[in-house]
A protein has these predicted regions:
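Membrane-embedded segments
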Residues: 2-88
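Catalytic metal-binding/acid-base residues of hydrolase active sites
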Residues: 8, 34, 63-64, 89-90, ...
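Active-site-proximal beta-strand elements of phosphoester/diester hydrolases
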Residues: 1-8, 98-108, 134-138, 201-207
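Conserved beta-sheet core of the metallophosphoesterase superfamily
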Residues: 139-224, 232-233
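Acidic/histidine-rich helix-loop elements
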Residues: 1-13, 33-41, 64-71, 109-114, ...
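Binuclear metal-dependent hydrolase catalytic cores centered on His/Asp/Glu-rich metal-binding motifs
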Residues: 75, 79-82, 94-136, 143-144, ...
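Beta-strand-turn-beta hairpins that frame and shape the catalytic cleft
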Residues: 1-2, 90-103, 130, 196-202, ...
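Conserved acidic residues
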Residues: 25-27, 54, 131-134, 152
């Protein structure tokens, strides 16, 4: 599986070739395929290439939903075969095994109470599932609200790797749209990489583009390559 997040770019040389080289079974996007301003054509163009490599599943990010023409953008994604998960899950089967891939919409609001309400409303729409369950969700900073909700793995983005990275250390700056969720502007708790809680793991993708006026420093763009193994193979 390949995870991408926070594309925020017109084009990225070598990106498609790198993803194709990994031969993923599926590709997932954890939000912000496009910026909230400008054309959404780069996001469509990217997905046209991705869908030729593997099935593509996506969830919304804040920049996606801030666009007045987001519905037009999603219609174009649907037309080329991208499945956007709006508070729903799909069952993926391979040989005799299956997993659930769930996705909920970005819960953007201006205060933490409304954000929590939006998350609860989204989770309530997901049908019950007793097997291995992966959640696609944009905002890594909200992991504490999700880590005890029964998901085995949460894939997230939004934090842009902390924008600046202290060498061998933490990310420094959180996106402005994280602040209403009681997340600190500086040195956010979750910014990139692998985090573990009892029964749940979260992988935070650093993102590809840069929507902020600040440059990325010690914080290279990334795609995340994830290999799931059956218990019998471990």
């Amino acid at each position: 599986m390949i995870q991408i997040s926070d594309y925020h770019a017109d084009s990225v040389p070598g990106l498609i070739e790198e993803i194709e080289h990994e031969s993923p079974d599926i590709i997932v996007s954890t939000g912000d395929l496009v910026h909230d301003t400008g054309s959404y054509t780069p996001g469509v163009r990217l997905c046209k290439h991705l869908i030729d490599i593997a099935p593509v599943y996506a969830v919304t990010g804040n920049h996606d939903l801030w666009r007045s023409d987001y519905e037009d953008f999603e219609r174009e994604l649907t037309a080329i075969g991208v499945k956007t998960l709006h508070d729903e899950r799909v069952i993926l089967k391979r040989n005799e095994s299956e997993i659930s891939l769930s996705g909920i919409d970005d819960p953007f609001a201006l205060n933490s109470v409304k954000i929590a309400e939006n998350i609860e409303n989204s989770l309530a729409k997901l049908p019950r599932y007793n097997g291995y369950d992966i959640l696609l969700f944009h905002r890594a900073n909200l992991f504490d609200r999700l880590k005890y909700r029964g998901f085995n793995l949460i894939l997230a983005g939004h934090m842009h790797g902390g924008q600046f990275r202290i060498p061998k250390g933490r990310g420094v700056v959180a996106p402005k749209s994280s602040w209403g969720s009681k997340s600190s502007m500086f040195f956010p708790k979750y910014f990139a990489g692998h985090y573990h809680a009892p029964h749940t793991d979260m992988i935070v993708n650093r993102g590809i583009g840069n929507p902020m006026l600040l440059p990325r420093l010690f914080n290279r763009p990334e795609i995340t390559v994830i290999t799931l193994k059956h218990k019998k193979e471990i």
